[in-house]
Amino acid sequence: MDQETVGNVVLLAIVTLISVVQNGFFAHKVEHESRTQNGRSFQRTGTLAFERVYTANQNCVDAYPTFLAVLWSAGLLCSQVPAAFAGLMYLLVRQKYFVGYLGERTQSTPGYIFGKRIILFLFLMSVAGIFNYYLIFFFGSDFENYIKTVTTTISPLLLIP
């Protein structure tokens, strides 16, 4: 691969690898809680603490393919930097959700809602990139610079709760 191609995806790859490490951390928590309760073997049933860790992990795993799809679509079709920033924010929010779920379930609600907003932002970036592609294809009009400016300007607003 040439440097330009790698430069167009390197931030997305970094966010993806960080998310893999986070998934490993979540899986380790499930395994640790299972072994704490059940000795050496892994079982899906156990104490309330294990049920919470297991459910929080499953909820994060269920949303993971959607996150990866919109992260890479937004980064490739629209703009890499705002997509990577939103991806990092999503990982922080997912961590907050996971830790919050281990305590009171109401503590996980802000992370869940914030995560949905970030997924929506990445989805809209992807749609804008696809829309721009078809504008170029059919009409020869390229709004890529405008879309990049808007997404770069809006992405810090994801920090507002």
Swiss-Prot record:
Give any single GO term for biological process. Answer: cellular response to calcium ion
Residue spans crossing the bilayer: 9-30, 53-77, 81-102, 116-128
Xref: InterPro entries: 5_LipOase_AP, FLAP/GST2/LTC4S_CS, MAPEG, MAPEG-like_dom_sf, Membr-assoc_MAPEG
User: Mind listing the UniProt keywords for this protein, alphabetically?
Assistant: Endoplasmic reticulum, Leukotriene biosynthesis, Membrane, Nucleus, Transmembrane, Transmembrane helix
Chain ranges on the Cytoplasmic side, renumbered to this chain: 31-52, 103-107
Q: Where in the cell is it found?
A: Nucleus membrane; Endoplasmic reticulum membrane
The answer, when asked if Endoplasmic reticulum is one of the entry's keywords, is yes
> Does the record's keyword annotation contain rRNA-binding?
no
Intramembrane extents: 108-115
GO cellular component labels: endoplasmic reticulum membrane; nuclear envelope; nuclear membrane
Tell me the membrane topology, using the record's own terms: Multi-pass membrane protein
Q: Which residues lie on this side of the membrane: Lumenal?
A: 1-8, 78-80, 129-161
- Entry's family note: Belongs to the MAPEG family.
How this chain assembles, per its entry, is: Homotrimer. Interacts with LTC4S and ALOX5.
Q: What does this protein do?
A: Required for leukotriene biosynthesis by ALOX5 (5-lipoxygenase). Anchors ALOX5 to the membrane. Binds arachidonic acid, and could play an essential role in the transfer of arachidonic acid to ALOX5. Binds to MK-886, a compound that blocks the biosynthesis of leukotrienes.
Q: Any notes on this protein's domains? A: The C-terminal part after residue 140 is mostly disordered.
Q: What is this protein called?
A: Arachidonate 5-lipoxygenase-activating protein
Gene field:
ALOX5AP
